[in-house]
Curated annotation (Swiss-Prot):
Protein name: Phosphate acyltransferase
Catalytic activity as recorded in UniProt: a fatty acyl-[ACP] + phosphate = an acyl phosphate + holo-[ACP]
Coiled-coil ranges (or none): none
Keyword Lipid biosynthesis belongs to the record: yes
EC number annotated for this UniProt entry: 2.3.1.274
Subcellular localization(s) per the UniProt record: Cytoplasm
Database matches in Gene3D superfamilies: Isopropylmalate Dehydrogenase (3.40.718.10)
This protein's UniProt keywords: Cytoplasm, Lipid biosynthesis, Lipid metabolism, Phospholipid biosynthesis, Phospholipid metabolism, Transferase
Function noted in UniProt: Catalyzes the reversible formation of acyl-phosphate (acyl-PO(4)) from acyl-[acyl-carrier-protein] (acyl-ACP). This enzyme utilizes acyl-ACP as fatty acyl donor, but not acyl-CoA.
């Protein structure tokens, strides 16, 4: 049985969507046990009796806009729903943690409580992103390391390759190195050095350099760069998707015929378009480099999306993704 700790109060839609997503997961997967940490009074309207569900009460939780995160957090906020869930994993009472709470707090607390795996030199944020090809695609590092080295990016590529193989069944995910041109000699020193490392590694199916204009349409399912570049890419993708949606709505509403066409012919295609650009189907961001499984669900996750974040976590545990990453990294260090 896979045991997961859930931050019941993290996220814009907590606790309702978090609790309901957890219950969906219990109904969908018969090999998990969940412990939800949060304010029982606020969660009560959405809770059910279930033999594989435990609830631990705490009235404290992190607001989504929290900024003051530091060493004092581990001492002063240890009874928040997020830190109690992380501590459950630290104490060996759960195999992984899922939270929609503030990213900075989750990464900081996980780093110092669960600890990084010794084999990886940095921790990275690895969100799943929607693309035109409609296949599971990871972007990393989405903001964790703006001063990364080539060896760190290689570690991130290895982690993502194993995660896509084990969690999503991708046989040979291609790694694309985000760069200003496709030629091997393009980019900064870190890009050139990373290109060489990726080209030579036996586990990596290297796509080559990937120009930003190709990100949504290429066959690469791992979009790799340092935290500064990848974070800009992620936010540009979010902004572009939002802008396209607004433009489409504006044009449809501009005339009677546009509205009629939307009702008669475009309803299903628009629904499919929205689903293809949504991360709800694939879950949350993986936190690469920690000694246990940590999944950061989107802050605005609704029940279905949170259920899929739980599915991510439970599959990572059942397929021993962390152990397999460690074995590969140990092998290359010997």
């Amino acid at each position: 049985m896979i045991k997961l700790a859930i931050d019941g109060m993290g996220g814009d839609n907590a606790p309702k969507e978090i609790v309901e997503g957890s219950i969906l997961a219990l109904k969908q997967f018969d090999d998990i046990e969940l412990t939800i940490f949060g304010d029982v009074d606020k969660m009560k309207p959405y809770l059910i009796e279930h033999p594989r569900l435990k609830v631990v009460h705490t009235p404290k939780y992190f607001e989504m806009g929290v900024k003051d995160i530091g060493r004092h957090t581990l001492r002063d906020d240890k009874d928040t729903s997020m830190l109690m869930a992380i501590n459950h994993v630290k104490e060996g009472l759960a195999d992984g943690v899922v939270s929609s709470g503030p990213t900075q707090a989750l990464i900081f607390a996980s780093f110092f409580m669960i600890r990084p795996m010794k084999e990886m030199k940095r921790v990275a944020i690895a969100p799943m992103v929607p693309t035109v090809i409609g296949k599971p695609t990871i972007l990393l590092d989405a903001g964790g390391n703006i001063d990364a080295k080539a060896e760190h990016l290689l570690d991130f590529a290895i982690f993502s390759t194993i995660a896509l193989k084990e969690v999503y069944g991708v046989k040979s995910p291609k790694v694309g190195l985000i760069n200003i041109g496709t030629e091997p000699g393009k980019g900064r020193d870190i890009d050139k050095e990373t290109f060489e490392l990726l080209s030579k590694h036996p586990l990596i199916d290297f796509y080559g350099n990937l120009e930003p204009k190709e990100i949504l349409t290429s066959d690469a399912q791992i979009l790799l760069s340092d935290g500064f570049t990848a974070n800009i890419v992620m936010k540009t993708m979010e902004g572009t998707a939002s802008a396209l949606g607004k433009i489409l709505k504006r044009e449809i509403k501009a005339s009677f015929w546009g509205k009629l066409a939307a009702v008669l012919f475009l309803k299903k295609p628009l629904k499919r378009f929205k689903q293809s650009m949504s991360a709800d189907e694939v879950g949350g961001a993986l936190i690469a480099g920690l000694d246990k499984v940590v999944v950061k669900a989107h802050g605005s996750s609704e029940a279905y999306a949170f259920m899929n974040a739980i599915r991510q976590a439970k599959t990572m545990v059942s397929h021993d993704v962390i152990g397999k990453v460690k074995n590969v990294l140990r092998g290359q260090d010997e």
